[in-house]
Amino acid sequence: MANSRRVSRVSSLIKREVSQMLLFDIKDDRVGAGMVSVTDVDLSGDLQHAKIFVSIYGTEEAKVETMEGLKSSEGYVRKELAQRIRLRRAPEVRFFEDHGIERGDKMLHLLNEIRETIPPEDESYNTED
């Protein structure tokens, strides 16, 4: 089993390489339907399984289409990782959509709505001392 520093280094290397593949190598038109970025790679301790989290900007239709394209390219990505990264065995790759940015945006929107409902002259909500 690899130590945590090695897992972290290999994860960041996989993230960089997959990002490059998304930009230049994966030719599936479905992947280009939405703007895709790799947000995180969760690598198992034995370096055999990689969960790749992606953020997709676009319509719901484009997101679904992009995820289908990514799922179909998992074998290609694994093969490319085996060639680009020196590991005994290339990890099994799975893509997952990361909804963190959407949730964060929704939370900011809700906080802004709450701020707008508080009257400006109300001193009870003033956080300055």
UniProtKB/Swiss-Prot annotation:
InterPro entries linked to this entry: KH_dom-like_a/b, RbfA, RbfA_dom_sf, Ribosome-bd_factorA_CS
**Entry keyword Cytoplasm:** yes
Extract the Pfam families matched here: RBFA (PF02033)
Keywords, alphabetical: Cytoplasm, Ribosome biogenesis
According to the UniProt entry, its GO molecular function terms are: ribosomal small subunit binding
The answer on whether this UniProt entry bears the keyword Chaperone reads no
Q: Where in the cell is it found?
A: Cytoplasm
Q: Can you quote a single GO CC term?
A: cytosol
Q: Where does the source fall among the domains of life?
A: Bacteria
The coiled-coil regions, if any, are none
Q: Tell me a GO biological process for this protein.
A: maturation of SSU-rRNA
Note the PANTHER family from the entry: RIBOSOME-BINDING FACTOR A, CHLOROPLASTIC-RELATED
Q: Which family does it belong to?
A: Belongs to the RbfA family.
Q: Which NCBIfam families match?
A: rbfA (TIGR00082)
By its UniProt entry, which HAMAP family does this protein fall under?
A: RbfA
Q: How does the record describe its quaternary structure?
A: Monomer. Binds 30S ribosomal subunits, but not 50S ribosomal subunits or 70S ribosomes.
What the protein does? One of several proteins that assist in the late maturation steps of the functional core of the 30S ribosomal subunit. Associates with free 30S ribosomal subunits (but not with 30S subunits that are part of 70S ribosomes or polysomes). Required for efficient processing of 16S rRNA. May interact with the 5'-terminal helix region of 16S rRNA.
Please report the name of this protein according to its UniProt entry.
Ribosome-binding factor A
